[in-house]
Amino acid sequence: MSLKFTNTLSKKKEDFISINPNQVKIYCCGVTVYDLCHLGHARSYLNWDVLRRFLIWKGFEVKFVQNFTDIDDKIINRANKEGCSTDELSERNIDEFHKDMDTLSILRPTSMPRATKCLHQIINFIEELEQKKVAYSSNGDVYFSVDKHKNYGKLSGREIEDQIDNAAGRLKTNQKESKKNSLDFALWKKSNSGEVSYSSPWGNGRPGWHIECSAMVKQELGESIDIHLGGSDLIFPHHENEIAQSEACNGKELAKYWLHNGMVNVGGEKMSKSLGNFTTIRSLLEEDISPMTLRFFVLQTNYRKPLDFTEEALKAASKGWERLNNCLSFGYIYKIKDQSKNEIFLDKPIKKSANTKLDKNSFKLLSDFEKYMDDDLNTSGALSILFELSQPIRKIINFLKEKDINEVDQDELNQVFNKWELLSELAGVLGLKVNLNQEKPKNNPELDTNKIEELIKNRSLAKANKDFLLADKIRADLKNIGIDLIDKPKGVTEWKQLSD
């Protein structure tokens, strides 16, 4: 089966064929950095992280670009409210964004351009649109002429005529005077007195939201890309407007494939900051929800479908991840001596291995996993394969609760280790990173205080190097396996096992 995606542009599931063989260029719309990220952001970026990991596993070279909108009305309003500059607010929230994404083991993009760092490219892009007579300036603003783009509405399926009256009713008085058409959208906005602004041929102002992405795509990836990503709430107007301005400027198709993730719902409504029904990633993790539980929860639902967020669903995901993690931990306990040298413990993509030692059943499961993922990233189906691979490992784990590993038939044990290696590889494709298991077999000689002491030493070094993110992560990892740390004077750290 070939790799297929549901393309919002064609409204069909299509075979994926990259523009250049073995190379994929991807652009993902990033966050507006005025606040902490919520679960809706986590859902989106976890899904696209898995897409990227899967493409790399299949042998593609992936260039993945994701932007930051660091100047916007929301940022200006929040900065005024907090009494800080827009730069200070943006910088702080960009740092917090990285902390959240790193904690969730989301691979950092190849490039993360910021709107304020791309002003030259944005202004040049707008000037090109003016030269092509598809943009016009008015009272310090610059607008895109929607009626000059014949295919406007091709992504969202909206007809221009159906939108004109609705748009006209939403216009402010000054916009009615400036716009030629109620659907025309801003490429450059004149700044109000006292607002942050940047110089331009049209006077002081700031870029419109849509033009940022078009300029950054062109700067980072060229005029045409393979895949454009975002939430379904961005289809109109943001992505529709991106297509219009990019294709009018470049005369080429902006993206072959448009993939959109569904929304996270709470009580039947979309989770959003405007509705006040959002849960931040930070607050979830502070409630002892592990990063891998959150990833597992998200991957149980296809990326295109709505994801219902309930406490019950999160608890079920926690139990499911615990079962899978117990099996992933098995190889570390009995085979892998150095965690730092094994790919399954690291936040990096995994490439497909030769898998020469697999039995017939394991080859079939490997094939089924790839078929599920090839079918529009069917992550729930892929997870079912991981649990099927886990069954013989679980059997051995249960045996070892009462017996010694030397009592297991060596051929059988070798086959189980082979299955574990495949399980670890496929879990890595989904970005599921093993946590050392709380549920150790009773006779396991490597429930090993040496490993705990080594992690504590690594944490102390991280603190000495002021790498507090790593130090906090080591503490969290130890807590996940039932170990609590107590920091004492003079840099001494003691530990104790948490009671059930």
UniProtKB/Swiss-Prot annotation:
Keyword Oxidoreductase present in the record's keywords: the answer is no
Query: Could you say which protein family the record assigns here?
Result: Belongs to the class-I aminoacyl-tRNA synthetase family.
SUPFAM superfamilies, sorted: Anticodon-binding domain of a subclass of class I aminoacyl-tRNA synthetases, Nucleotidylyl transferase
Complexes and interactors:
Monomer.
Q: Which GO terms describe its biological process?
A: cysteinyl-tRNA aminoacylation
Q: Which UniProt keywords apply?
A: Aminoacyl-tRNA synthetase, ATP-binding, Cytoplasm, Ligase, Metal-binding, Nucleotide-binding, Protein biosynthesis, Zinc
Reaction it catalyzes? tRNA(Cys) + L-cysteine + ATP = L-cysteinyl-tRNA(Cys) + AMP + diphosphate
Q: What is this protein called?
A: Cysteine--tRNA ligase
Task: Locate the residues binding ATP.
Answer: 273
Gene3D superfamilies hit by this protein: Cysteine-tRNA ligase, C-terminal anti-codon recognition domain (1.20.120.1910), HUPs (3.40.50.620)
Instruction: Write out the GO MF terms.
Output: ATP binding; cysteine-tRNA ligase activity; zinc ion binding
Q: In the UniProt record, what gene is named as encoding this protein?
A: cysS
Listed cofactors:
Zn(2+)
Q: Where is this motif: 'HIGH' region?
A: 31-41
Instruction: Cite the Pfam families for this sequence.
Output: DALR_2, tRNA-synt_1e
